[in-house]
Regions:
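Short hydrophobic/aromatic patch on the recognition helix
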Residues: 45-55
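Short secondary-structure transition hinges
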Residues: 103-145, 164-165, 192
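Hydrophobic/aromatic-rich alpha-helical bundle segments in the mid-to-C-terminal region
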Residues: 109-110, 129, 151-202, 213-214
Length: 214
């Protein structure tokens, strides 16, 4: 009996992964905004009814993609932090890792933007939304640890603020700049600025705002 239950669970997880793969492929083709559940069902070669067994609506599906994105981003942050000794350098490395992640995985970056657009009142503690909250906490924990380390080693100002607050502020700042770089490239170019210049300036200002020396 346990064997059958295990097999069913494995099959359920395999199907869920296939649906997320199909959603990711569809989003690359048409964009997350234009993506529909019908398109994902066709890409996954499933009926709409079966798709809704796994994901209750498009938002739920996006949260599934967001959870994938955060798992990857957490690993990128861990790798980035591991290459530096000083806390402030770890913070900057996380910023660069976030930018590289957004450029390498635009669908995941878009799913994170959709997640950030949901208000706190809409966030649950279970299902795909809850998984995203937990995964997001893990990502922030890496950045918080880097900020805390910087305060201990003297590279981050002790009066910069509580590390969790600093982490959320830096995240919000860079997330907003990334949205500008993604959606307003033509306007930036009109003003004589490239997206890369904007991103480098954001990293410079973000780290300088909390560094003891730069």
């Amino acid at each position: 009996m346990n064997y059958l239950i295990e097999r069913r669970q494995e099959e359920k997880e395999r199907r869920r992964v296939e649906i997320l793969d199909a959603a990711e492929a569809t989003a690359r083709e048409v964009g997350i905004g234009a993506m529909t559940m019908d398109q994902v069902a066709r890409k996954a070669r499933l009926s709409r009814a079966l798709l809704y067994v796994y994901f209750q609506d498009k938002d739920d599906l996006l949260f599934g993609l967001c959870n994938r994105a955060l798992d990857i981003l957490e690993q990128r942050f861990i790798e980035a932090v591991g290459r530096h000794k000083l806390g402030i350098d770890q913070v900057e490395a996380c910023g660069r890792a976030y930018i590289a992640f957004a450029q390498e995985f635009p669908v995941y970056a878009e799913s994170l933007a959709a997640f950030e657009a949901h208000s706190v009142e809409q966030l649950a503690t279970e299902g795909n939304v809850g998984a995203c909250v937990i995964a997001g906490d893990r990502v922030h924990a890496v950045l918080i640890a880097a900020i805390t380390r910087g305060m201990a080693d003297g590279s981050v100002r002790p009066d910069a603020g509580p590390p969790p607050l600093v982490s959320f502020t830096l995240w919000g700042f860079l997330h907003g700049v990334l949205q500008l770089a993604t959606n307003k490239a033509a306007i930036l170019a009109h003003g004589g600025t490239t997206t890369q210049q904007l991103l480098e300036q954001a990293l410079l200002q973000g780290t300088r705002s909390i560094a003891t020396r730069r």
